[in-house]
From Swiss-Prot:
Protein name, UniProt field: UPF0194 membrane protein CKO_02332
Coiled coil (UniProt feature): 142-207
Domain of life: Bacteria
Record lineage: Bacteria, Pseudomonadati, Pseudomonadota, Gammaproteobacteria, Enterobacterales
Source organism of the structure: Citrobacter koseri (strain ATCC BAA-895 / CDC 4225-83 / SGSC4696)
Family the entry assigns: Belongs to the UPF0194 family.
Keywords noted in UniProt: Coiled coil, Periplasm, Signal
Length: 331
């Protein structure tokens, strides 16, 4: 009789343990917060900053892209020509600026001084001739027209003398500060144009801004492109973000840094891990894409969860179940 009693007691104890375990599991599930979200779709529309003819594309839709990878190239010839022209412009402006700083050579000053002497001699002759003509005019030996011609020759010689003297003075004192400043500004303008030409040539190569997967290839080689027109669309694969929404009643559980578990239909028994990286400071009406029926008419707060152990199986747009359990909090 003792053996059946022992068996009965063992069965009762096992049932109690199972009942207690079931109650504990259900209480843990009931205390945890479950939300529904989607892996965020993050894309970059890539384009050339300059326009031109598309020479080549090195990638196709579905290709894995790495940051810094060359994706496409425009025809460089027009921009290489512009760069050569800009370099020549800098050389001309630099030579003019150096000339302004250096002033005039001794040979130029000597030539200017000789020109002053020659102009002075011409003026002295014209002045003496005019004075003689004045004496003859008084005795009515010459006509008024002859006197006027002599005066005109004297005035012309005087003007030429002053011009030669001014030129000599300029040569001796050097260029004016205003002229030097103007030459410097012209040089800086040419240098800026050169820098822009170098940048334009550099921008004929399209570089991937980050890792990802190529979604679309909008054009083909040979196409004429405007600056800024979309050439390729890149899907950013890292980091992986999940977008979800929480109502005000449960907002206190969704604090930045909180660790959570993320389940997908393809991995119902092996969750991903993540942390809340952002909680929207303002409420909004629930978007139509939210799958929880009781939240669709509520004001909710948007969450961004950063997946810390993402792999290639976690695709953009994929629905995800988020569990805010005590295990996730302390894991």
């Amino acid at each position: 009789m003792k053996k059946p009693v022992v068996i009965a007691l063992a069965v009762a104890a096992l049932a109690a343990v199972l009942a207690g375990g079931t109650w504990w599991y259900q209480s843990r599930q009931d205390n945890g917060l479950t939300l529904y979200g989607n892996v965020d779709i993050r894309t970059v529309n890539m384009s050339f900053r300059v326009g031109g003819r598309l020479a080549s594309l090195a990638v196709d839709e579905g290709d894995a892209i790495t940051s810094g990878q060359v994706l496409g190239v425009l025809d460089k010839a027009p921009y290489e020509n512009a760069l050569m022209q800009a370099k020549a412009g800098v050389s001309v402006a630099q030579a003019q600026y150096d000339l302004m700083l250096a002033g005039y050579r001794d040979e130029e000053i000597a030539q200017a001084a000789a020109a002053v002497k020659q102009a002075q001699a011409a003026f002295d002759y014209a002045q003496n001739f005019y004075q003689r003509q004045q004496g003859l005019w008084k005795s009515r030996t010459i006509s008024a027209n002859d006197l006027e011609n002599a005066r005109s020759s004297r005035d012309q010689a005087q003007a030429q003398l002053k011009s030669a003297q001014d030129k000599l003075s300029q040569y001796r004192t050097g260029n004016r500060q205003q002229d030097i400043a103007q030459a410097k500004a012209s040089l800086e303008q040419a240098q800026a144009q050169l820098a822009q030409s170098e940048l334009d040539l550099q921008d004929t190569t399209l570089i991937a801004p980050s890792d990802g997967t190529l979604l679309t290839r909008a054009v083909e080689p040979g196409s004429m492109l405007n600056a800024g027109s979309t050439v390729l669309t890149l899907s950013l694969t890292r980091p992986v973000w999940v977008r979800a929404y929480v109502d005000e009643r449960n907002l206190s559980q969704a604090q930045p840094g909180r660790e959570i578990l993320l389940y997908t239909d393809g991995r119902p028994d092996k969750p991903y891990h993540g942390k809340i990286g952002f909680v929207s400071p303002t409420a909004e009406f629930t978007p139509k894409t939210v799958e929880t029926p009781d939240l669709r008419t509520d004001l909710v707060y948007r969450l961004r969860i950063v997946v810390t152990d993402a792999d290639d199986a976690l695709r953009q747009g994929m629905p995800v179940t988020l569990t805010f359990s005590d295990e996730a909090r302390h894991e």
